[in-house]
């Protein structure tokens, strides 16, 4: 009886040994299959090395975090770390017609040397006033862009806009601006090209509404189609002093900055990222009555001013003097 028990015991132990061996082989096979599948996947974004300081989107300043506005345009992309380019990825090419780096200290530099001043005799499109070159002036603090009441029923307002003669592509765009305050006003810093120039409508924007200058708006367009725009609260009132605003437009992503802090970015490889070099624009305007639901009824007195004291462009992959340097120098002084 005892001998039989020992035989059964050996038999059961042998079975468990076989089961353990089979289980181990199964686990090893699954592990090897997972590795093979990962490396054979066409989408290798999850395998790339994350940058030393990963950026998550939307991005908020560490101290006073801007929350997305309660407005209808709360379309921030889901949070995702920004991957670094793969080592074997070819360097992205600059867009055709893109010009070299520049920096303009507006107020000191003669604006007309680099910028075209928009001009019209009457309101057109969705703009509620005539473009008036005389509403752009150089001052000790920078170049002012004024919106004025005209007292004319047909032309109730005069508005201001300047755009570069040259076109610019991938790189970092910066401006130091103090925004005009008052319901009905729109201040904008953006790149644009479109059918007027024989191009698709491509655009990257930073916009402010004078009715609430504690908010900032980010937009982008490709071939007339709008990407995922967003509105953020600022930790300051943009009408009370100059601040540094910027966006970095790259082939696979656009990132927007306020005072050097990243606030928002498009999704990686978003199909709405522009692909055509455009002109740099600054504008200050009020719209036709249909636009008042967005920017408010004009109620800013007889004149309101947006001031731009610096504008710069640094091409992708280059390191040039920019408005960031000017802003730091002014703060330090």
Predicted regions and their residues:
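N-terminal Lys/Arg-rich, disordered targeting/topogenic segments
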Residues: 1-14
């Amino acid at each position: 009886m005892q001998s039989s028990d020992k035989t059964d015991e050996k038999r059961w132990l042998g079975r468990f040994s076989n089961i353990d061996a089979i289980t181990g082989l199964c686990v090893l096979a699954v592990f090897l299959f997972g590795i093979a599948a990962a490396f054979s996947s066409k989408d290798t974004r999850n395998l790339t090395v994350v940058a030393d300081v990963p950026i998550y989107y939307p991005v908020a300043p560490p101290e006073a975090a801007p929350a997305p506005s309660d407005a209808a345009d709360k379309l921030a992309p889901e949070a995702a770390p920004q991957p670094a380019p793969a080592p074997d990825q070819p360097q992205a090419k600059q867009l055709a017609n893109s010009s070299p780096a520049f920096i303009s200290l507006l107020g000191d530099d003669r604006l007309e040397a680099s910028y075209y001043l928009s001009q019209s005799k009457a309101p057109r499109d969705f703009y509620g006033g005539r473009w008036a070159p005389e509403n752009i002036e150089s001052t000790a603090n920078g170049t002012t862009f004024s919106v004025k009441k005209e007292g004319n029923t047909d032309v109730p307002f005069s508005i201001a806009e300047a755009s570069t003669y040259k076109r610019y592509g991938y790189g970092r765009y910066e401006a130091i601006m103090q925004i005009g305050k008052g319901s009905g006003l729109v201040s904008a810093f953006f790149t644009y090209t479109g059918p007027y120039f024989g191009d698709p409508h491509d655009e990257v924007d930073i916009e402010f509404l004078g009715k609430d200058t504690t908010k900032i708006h980010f937009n982008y367009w490709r071939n007339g189609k709008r990407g995922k725009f967003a509105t953020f609260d600022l930790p300051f009132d943009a009408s009370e002093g100059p601040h540094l605003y910027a966006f970095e437009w790259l082939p696979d992503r656009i990132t927007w900055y306020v005072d050097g802090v990243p606030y928002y970015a498009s999704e990686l490889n978003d199909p709405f990222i522009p692909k055509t070099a455009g002109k740099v624009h600054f504008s200050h305007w009020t719209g036709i009555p249909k636009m008042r639901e967005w920017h408010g009824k004009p109620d800013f007195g007889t004149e309101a001013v947006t001031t731009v004291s610096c504008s710069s462009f640094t091409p992708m992959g280059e390191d040039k003097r920019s408005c960031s340097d000017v802003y730091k120098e002014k703060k330090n002084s």
